[in-house]
Amino acid sequence: MGCLHSKTANLPSSDDPSAPNKPESVNGDQVDQEIQNFKEFELNELRKATNGFSPSCIVSEGGEKAPNVVYRGKLEGNHLVAIKRFSRQSWPDAQQFVVEATGVGKLRNKRIVSLIGCCAEGDERLLVAEYMPNDTLSKHLFHWEKQPLPWDMRVRIADYIAEALDYCNIENRKIYHDLNAYRILFDEEGDPRLSTFGLMKNSRDGKSYSTNLAYTPPEFLRTGRVIPESVIFSYGTILLDLLSGKHIPPSHALDIIRGKNALLLMDSSLEGQYANDDATKLVDLASKCLQSEAKDRPDTKFLLSAVAPLQKQEEVASHVLMGLPKNTVILPTMLSPLGKACAKMDLATFHDILLKTGYRDEEGAENELSFQEWTQQVQEMLNTKKFGDIAFRDKDFKNSIEYYSKLVGMMPVPSATVFARRAFSYLMTDQQELALRDAMQAQVCIPEWPTAFYLQALALSKLGMETDAQDMLNDGAAYDAKRQNSWRC
């Protein structure tokens, strides 16, 4: 078959100074290469970017039923963006919407997500912001999969969001609507940033808080109005989230604090990661922020002075603290179904997709007619392939290996699909080295075939080579994106 080559052989070491420190793309699409100047977009441009505002592009909570929906979009030049689509009645005055958006769009700071455009065409009111590829604080704090957020990262989040609020305060943007864990996003380096969408309030519906009323500032419940001190109260609820790792109503938290049981608030997964004195200081700050009287709450400068000294590992990058890969970050939401199955090590789903795909990925390749020729000329070859496919379908991987191995020796032209199926069969029988070899052979047959890279990622992960596995996953995702004639959300 000739010399086998896998990109794992040329992977840079994590200690290699030549290895890139800053991710530059997600699935081959550009993320945050340069912050664009604020502009007014054409509706058709944003419709195209979201595949016609396809439901599959929605990344916000609540899906289509939410009053304001956020989509993932891709502009010309493969720049990923987040597009917020307001309900038709939210901003009846188009000029007011554009003026407000333009004002917010002037804000530029490393602690906030930049608003780069808007659209007010017909009944549509849309905002366009930088795309943050590493999900929300809510996801990392309440719905984590691999590891809970460590203490040092939680302190950093508290510090960076305090910086963001202080910057907005300096720029006379003192009102932030519905500050919660969904409004804190993570960029390509894993740094937390404050969404600028919260700086724009729906002008008609007056709803500044969409979360449970138990978490809203007391003055909002009394008057329906938001004041600068309301933002400090909401920051206090963020501190509670970070301390406890769960949603705790402020009134309940204050009862615990007044009872001198502050450490009972702490997330049990953080045990041994913090000094009690540091935790007590954060709890005390949360208590100050959650005072029922707005005048008793601290300002943003006080937040900074209280939180900044608690950072102990400022020299450690956020992606390291969070356990994110150092190289290109690939989000599950940006992967194809096969890529998602690979990322989750979901072998059952991976098997199902291989079955459904069949041999279609070899169409157009040099060997596309090989099976057709075999079925016409060699009945034994046809039967061997048939029995191998049946065994693979029935998850009889021992026999699928036997039949596919026999078929490999009979094929006049190598088949990437046969190697892929045998590779998966080897994986399912704990023969990872053989699985990796076959996945590499599949790559030789079709050099830019995502399936071959995903199989290598699975095998490398099983072998404990996580860095190399992540690299293969990234490559597979990039080739997945490249293979699309038009972007699918």
Swiss-Prot record:
Reactions that this protein is recorded to catalyse: L-seryl-[protein] + ATP = O-phospho-L-seryl-[protein] + ADP + H(+); L-threonyl-[protein] + ATP = O-phospho-L-threonyl-[protein] + ADP + H(+)
Residues the entry annotates as binding ATP: 62-70, 84
Gene Ontology molecular-function annotations: ATP binding; protein serine kinase activity; protein serine/threonine kinase activity
UniProt key word Cytoplasm: no
Family: Belongs to the protein kinase superfamily. Ser/Thr protein kinase family.
Localisation per UniProt entry: Cell membrane
Protein name: Serine/threonine-protein kinase BSK2
EC number, UniProt record: 2.7.11.1
Active-site residue list: 178
Organism annotation: Arabidopsis thaliana (Mouse-ear cress)
GO annotation, cellular component aspect: plasma membrane
GO process terms (BP): brassinosteroid mediated signaling pathway
Domain of life: Eukaryota
Record keyword Nucleotide-binding present: yes
